[in-house]
Design a protein with these regions (language model features):
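Extreme N-terminal tail/first-helix region
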Residues: 1-23
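Charged, gly/pro-rich active-site loop segments
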Residues: 2-8, 82-162
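Short Pro/Gly-enriched beta-strand edge/turn motifs at strand-loop
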Residues: 11-13, 23-28, 127-130
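Amphipathic alpha-helical interface surfaces
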Residues: 17, 65, 116-119
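A generic structural signal for nonpolar/aromatic side chains embedded in well-ordered alpha-helices
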Residues: 20-21, 68-69, 123
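Short beta-strand segments
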Residues: 24-61
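Beta-strand secondary-structure signal
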Residues: 28, 56, 76, 104, ...
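Helix-adjacent hinge/juxtasegments
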Residues: 60, 64-87, 94
């Protein structure tokens, strides 16, 4: 990805990046539908294995999002956490402290029941930090999207020192 403008805010420590993935609960998925941008907020799960980030999404088994991915599987994602607004005596110095993660990857619609069950377990572990098992019947009524992330960057904007 292109270099970050405020490089002093960039996070390189993978443990801090994984913390953003744990704390955030919604990911915004950007797609292109023909010549029109389309962004959807979604709950997610993730795995980070062998230095490879994978994001798992669930939703309906039909709809615009899946239609777009079938035509163009390239996606962009963004998530944030630790949002803390701050004020100042000058309007232009008001702001927001946060941590964020964004990147791009290739989305695949998962049809295999075992992989869907695994994805649902990962998603629930990420969202509520509990282990759940899913069966074929439950997996059959849910659409699963797997994003194999090719690039990502993370950022932390701290609270200003007073």
């Amino acid at each position: 990805m292109n270099g970050m403008t405020r490089r002093e805010h960039q996070i390189f420590d993978i443990d801090k990046i994984l913390e953003i993935l744990e704390k955030s609960k919604v990911v915004h998925i950007g797609m292109v539908d023909g010549d029109e941008p389309y962004v959807v907020p979604m709950n997610y799960g993730y795995t980070y294995e062998n230095e490879k980030l994978t994001i798992w999404l669930h939703g309906a088994t039909t709809g615009r999002k899946l239609d777009i991915i079938r035509k163009n599987p390239k996606v962009f994602f963004e998530m944030e956490c630790d949002l803390v607004p701050f004020d100042c005596d000058v309007a232009c110095k008001y702001g927001l402290s946060y941590s964020s993660l964004m990147g791009k990857g290739i989305a695949t619609i998962i049809e295999n029941s075992e992989e869907k069950q695994k994805a649902l377990s990962i998603l629930m572990k990420t969202q509520v930090d509990m282990d759940f098992e899913f069966n074929e019947k439950l997996a059959s009524v849910v659409g699963i999207i797997k994003i194999e992330v090719s690039e990502f960057t993370a950022k932390h904007r701290p609270l200003p020192s007073k």
